[in-house]
């Protein structure tokens, strides 16, 4: 009987819907883990259509030396600092802390190691799925090094 109850409880728990807060935070983590580990193909899956060309451009700047340096240092680690969803549940923002990260500068392709940085991600709801809107960065403090 305990096995039946265990299966029943597990089934009920797994059927519960994630809250919008949990959804946006998990989407942000999944995106950042892919983005800061140069896995732009996966990052595109979590991105708006308007972000695709920017991610393709970044992917074209990744060379074998970048991948080797990433492999030597290890994967970037991502955590959520804060998140906010607008009242109508159509837009959100998540501030992530990324540790052990490499940043490739779009102009020139120079790679820089950053022990810790924050990235503010803008999310929009498209067809009932949260997606990251990541376009060419502005010099407005949206991405800041600690």
Task: Mark where each language-model region is.
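Short, low-complexity N-terminal intrinsically disordered segments enriched in polar/charged residues
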Residues: 13-37, 45
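Short solvent-exposed beta->alpha transition segments
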Residues: 25, 40-102
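Short beta-strand or tight-loop elements
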Residues: 8, 76-79, 117-119
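Sec-dependent bacterial lipoprotein signal peptides
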Residues: 1-13
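Intrinsically disordered, low-complexity segments enriched in polar/charged residues with Gly/Pro
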Residues: 20-21, 69-72, 107-111
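Exposed beta-sheet edge and beta->alpha loop/turn motif
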Residues: 85-146
């Amino acid at each position: 009987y305990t096995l039946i109850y265990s299966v029943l409880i597990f089934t009920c728990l797994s059927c519960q819907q994630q809250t919008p807060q949990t959804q946006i935070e998990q989407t942000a983590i999944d995106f950042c883990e892919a983005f800061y580990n140069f896995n732009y193909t996966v990052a595109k899956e979590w991105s708006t259509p308007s972000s695709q060309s920017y991610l393709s451009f970044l992917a074209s700047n990744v060379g074998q030396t970048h991948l080797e340096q990433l492999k030597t240092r290890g994967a970037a680690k991502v955590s959520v600092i804060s998140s906010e969803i607008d009242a109508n549940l159509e837009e959100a923002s998540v501030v992530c802390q990324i540790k052990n990260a490499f940043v490739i500068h779009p102009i020139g392709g120079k790679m820089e190691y950053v022990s810790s940085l924050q990235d503010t991600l803008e999310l929009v709801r498209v067809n009932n799925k949260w997606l990251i809107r990541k376009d060419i960065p502005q010099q407005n403090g949206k991405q800041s090094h600690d």
